């Protein structure tokens, strides 16, 4: 189902619900979209998507960082509202991806690098059904400035292609989901490149898929626009998954409609 069609479905079939931010939403549960990464890079075209922001955010996740100062150095401010006065967010995505706490009596500081482990499985055990990364750590959720919205993802190898499915528990359809689609598609392409595979599918599965009440007018404007064909992306191969830089990515043929501004529900 195309993104725009899912939004229309939410607006016409969704349930009015309250939410943590007090804004109010129109919500549907358990929806799915699929994107063929062998043919295109799914960067939304009915409005401008901030590719620089999502690319730097992904690289920041892969660094395993909990502090936004590196993002600020690159003029990316998407996490500013949640950070404390020192720029810290607590043990959010990158920390869980790269250093999930797993203490033992022998090593109380032991951690698990989920990303490295999964990449190793993709390379050496491609039929494994355990190629999973989780950002949802119940023991640390209360320490996070914002609990993970995109909570868990799984990789799958078939016919020399790498696919990925994301489960997103909370889906801000206007501001968050376009970012998440492109970010995990980019990650899948990077992982495939490092493993010597071709990109397959990105499958997005959403739990609470919602349109905030104060985003409805923006969506009505957006849904009146005709989508352009998706662009493609060129990725210069880095020495390792953790050595990519923003300059290694080149989006090709990105034809898009203008930006539509909307408030963030914090």
Swiss-Prot record:
The record's NCBIfam families line, in alphabetical order, gives: PRK01827.1-3 (NF002497), PRK01827.1-5 (NF002499), thym_sym (TIGR03284)
What is the recorded name of this protein?
Thymidylate synthase
Annotated residues for binding of (6R)-5,10-methylene-5,6,7,8-tetrahydrofolate: 172, 265
Q: How does it assemble?
A: Homodimer.
What EC number(s) would the UniProt record show? 2.1.1.45
Q: Which organism is it from?
A: Bifidobacterium longum (strain NCC 2705)
The enzyme's first-digit EC class, named in words, is: transferase
Biological processes per GO annotation: dTMP biosynthetic process; dTTP biosynthetic process; methylation
Of which family is this protein a member? Answer: Belongs to the thymidylate synthase family. Bacterial-type ThyA subfamily.
Q: Which InterPro entries match?
A: Thymidate_synth/dCMP_Mease (IPR045097), Thymidate_synth/dCMP_Mease_dom (IPR023451), Thymidate_synth/dCMP_Mease_sf (IPR036926), Thymidylate_synthase (IPR000398), Thymidylate_synthase_AS (IPR020940)
**HAMAP family, per the entry:** Thymidy_synth_bact
Q: Where is the active site?
A: 149
Quote the pathway field: Pyrimidine metabolism; dTTP biosynthesis
Compartments where found: Cytoplasm
Key words, A-Z:
Cytoplasm, Methyltransferase, Nucleotide biosynthesis, Transferase
Q: Name one Pfam family in it.
A: Thymidylat_synt
What reaction does this enzyme carry out catalytically?
dUMP + (6R)-5,10-methylene-5,6,7,8-tetrahydrofolate = 7,8-dihydrofolate + dTMP
Which GO molecular function terms does the record list? thymidylate synthase activity
Q: For dUMP, which residues are the binding ones? A: 20, 129-130, 169-172, 180, 210-212
Database matches in CDD domains: TS_Pyrimidine_HMase
Q: What's in the GO CC field?
A: cytosol
Function text: Catalyzes the reductive methylation of 2'-deoxyuridine-5'-monophosphate (dUMP) to 2'-deoxythymidine-5'-monophosphate (dTMP) while utilizing 5,10-methylenetetrahydrofolate (mTHF) as the methyl donor and reductant in the reaction, yielding dihydrofolate (DHF) as a by-product. This enzymatic reaction provides an intracellular de novo source of dTMP, an essential precursor for DNA biosynthesis.
UniProt cross-references to PANTHER family, sorted A to Z: THYMIDYLATE SYNTHASE 1
């Amino acid at each position: 189902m195309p993104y725009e069609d899912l939004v229309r479905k939410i607006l016409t079939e969704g349930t009015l619900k309250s939410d943590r931010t007090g804004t109010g939403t129109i919500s549907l549960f358990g929806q799915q979209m699929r994107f063929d990464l062998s043919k295109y890079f799914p960067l939304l075209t009915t409005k401008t998507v901030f590719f620089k922001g999502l690319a730097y955010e992904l690289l920041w996740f892969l660094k395993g960082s909990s502090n936004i100062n590196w993002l600020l150095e690159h003029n990316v401010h998407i996490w500013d509202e949640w950070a404390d006065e020192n720029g810290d967010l607590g043990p959010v995505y990158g920390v869980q991806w790269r250093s999930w706490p797993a203490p033992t009596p022998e090593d109380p500081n032991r951690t698990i690098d989920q990303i490295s482990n999964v990449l190793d499985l993709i390379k050496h055990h491609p039929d494994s059904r355990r190629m999973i990364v989780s950002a949802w750590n119940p023991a640390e959720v209360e320490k996070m400035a914002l609990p993970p919205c995109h909570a868990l993802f799984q990789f799958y190898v078939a016919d020399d292609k790498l696919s990925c499915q994301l489960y997103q528990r909370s889906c801000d359809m206007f501001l968050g989901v376009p970012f998440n689609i492109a970010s995990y598609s980019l990650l899948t392409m990077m992982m495939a490149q490092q493993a010597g595979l071709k990109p397959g599918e990105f499958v997005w599965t959403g739990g609470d898929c919602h349109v905030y009440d104060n985003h409805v007018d923006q969506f009505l404007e957006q849904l009146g626009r005709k989508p352009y064909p998706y662009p493609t992306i060129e990725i210069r191969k880095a020495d390792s998954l953790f050595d990519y830089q923003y300059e290694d990515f080149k989006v090709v043929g990105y034809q898009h409609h203008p930006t539509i501004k909307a408030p963030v529900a914090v």
